[in-house]
């Protein structure tokens, strides 16, 4: 299971040709397909098989705009564990950026 709700930012197109992936760091149980308002807090660089597949990490609107170190390590560990079981898959995690870079990336990917 995913450690936090995982989905995508509406009306975006990332480097892999899909919508921009997002983790919403919350203790609240979200339903599959539920559309929520969130605040981007970080951008985690990820390259998968040579394609940019960065992840936006955010919190629900109205929550404190903080993703703590434990949540960050949990997400990094989850991503690494998912790809460690896929033969031939090349995946690399890069720099963790702050909110301003996450917002710039989302704006750049808007369609």
Describe the predicted segments one by one.
Residues 1-111:
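Hydrophobic N-terminal alpha-helices or hydrophobic patches in metabolic proteins across all domains
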